[in-house]
């Protein structure tokens, strides 16, 4: 008898923490990376959740700091022949899908994502096959194989609008892999949404009791929440949105103090946007519980200066992203659908 894969029961081993560098070592690797970027005709694209020193280096070298989709779009438009992707593996895959002619390097190919790991292609395909009447919508935080199985790829920034659109056409939805984001979208739209039961290990750890206590300490603070968080956290929020939307909310909200319920890597760009405001981390544990991620993705933390330098210098199988041609073709279709839909929203 086959056993159904249960994303909620899955335990993902965390990678070891990178060895800290002293100031001299940091400066050595920063200069080495700058030199290698020029030698390789490369540009660095970094996610909001990488460490501040990585984001700063991307800025200094003419690169990009953004969400996963904008990272890939920036890379596709840039003249560089090589992209150094500081993030997790699905981000490198997305960049390769959109820029197959470019050399896509990563500091390490072992940088995973719990949402990606929690949606293995064989089990997900069987799930989709069991519901053939539903349109398959998958989050960007998935493998190339899962994207190729989908009808649409979506980011959190346009998830509500896309599901509203599909619902208006009378379509029923399979949503994967994040159950919290799927539930949020369903409540916002009223659509018929069947959710795969994955979750982000960082956002899944935010706790209402601990957050309530923090709100009592800072009663005038606004709460900014990423919709990958549990429903109980989302319901407490003053603003809910994607990484880029939360940064915009930080600027528009009048509050001088902001409690932020997402990966603390976002604080680098958010603090730049609102230097006059105080940013507070939402708690990820409480009532005797201990956090595992402590509001920072352990795989994002693998993108250290030494690893980036090694990726640029060595390349090869340990650092270069490859996507099977057939998978790329299959994944490109739902990605392009999303890009075209997003363009209509901006028009």
UniProtKB/Swiss-Prot annotation:
Its EC number is 2.5.1.72. Its main location: cytoplasm. It holds the Pfam family NadA. The gene is nadA. It comes from Salmonella newport (strain SL254). Keywords: 4Fe-4S, Cytoplasm, Iron, Iron-sulfur, Metal-binding, Pyridine nucleotide biosynthesis, Transferase. Belongs to the quinolinate synthase family. Type 1 subfamily. Its cofactor is [4Fe-4S] cluster. Catalyzes the condensation of iminoaspartate with dihydroxyacetone phosphate to form quinolinate. Pathway: Cofactor biosynthesis; NAD(+) biosynthesis; quinolinate from iminoaspartate: step 1/1. It is an enzyme of class 2 (transferase). This is Quinolinate synthase. Iminosuccinate binds at residues 47, 68, 139-141, 156, 226-228, 243.
């Amino acid at each position: 008898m086959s056993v159904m894969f249960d994303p909620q029961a899955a335990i993902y081993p965390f990678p070891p923490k990178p060895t800290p560098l002293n100031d001299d070592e940091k400066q050595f690797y920063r200069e080495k990376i700058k030199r290698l970027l020029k030698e390789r005709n490369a540009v660095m694209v970094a996610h909001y959740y990488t460490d501040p020193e990585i984001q700063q280096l991307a800025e200094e070298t003419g690169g990009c700091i953004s969400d996963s989709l904008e990272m890939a779009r920036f890379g596709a438009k840039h003249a560089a022949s090589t992209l150094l992707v500081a993030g997790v593996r699905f981000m490198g895959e997305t960049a390769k899908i959109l820029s197959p002619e470019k050399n896509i390097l990563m500091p390490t190919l072992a940088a995973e994502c719990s949402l990606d790991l929690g949606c293995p292609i064989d089990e997900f395909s069987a799930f989709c096959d069991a519901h053939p009447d539903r349109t398959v919508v998958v989050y960007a935080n998935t493998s190339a194989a899962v994207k190729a199985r989908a009808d649409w790829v979506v980011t959190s920034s346009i998830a509500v609008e896309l599901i509203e659109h599909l619902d208006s056409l009378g379509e029923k939805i399979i949503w994967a892999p994040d159950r919290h984001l799927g539930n949020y979208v369903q409540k916002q739209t009223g659509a018929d949404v069947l959710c795969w039961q994955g979750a982000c290990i960082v956002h899944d750890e935010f706790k209402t009791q601990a957050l309530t206590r923090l709100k009592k300490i800072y009663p005038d603070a606004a709460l900014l929440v990423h919709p990958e968080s549990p429903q109980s956290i989302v319901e407490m929020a003053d603003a809910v949105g994607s990484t880029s939307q939360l940064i915009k909310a930080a600027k528009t909200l009048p509050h001088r103090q902001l409690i932020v319920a997402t990966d603390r890597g976002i604080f680098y760009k958010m603090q730049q946007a609102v230097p006059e405001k105080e940013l507070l981390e939402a708690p990820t544990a409480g009532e005797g519980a201990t956090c595992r991620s402590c509001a920072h993705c352990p795989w994002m933390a693998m993108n250290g200066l030494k690893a980036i330098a090694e990726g640029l210098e060595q390349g090869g199988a340990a650092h270069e992203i490859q996507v099977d041609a057939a998978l790329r073709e299959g994944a490109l279709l739902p990605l392009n659908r999303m890009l075209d839909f997003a363009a209509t929203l901006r028009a």
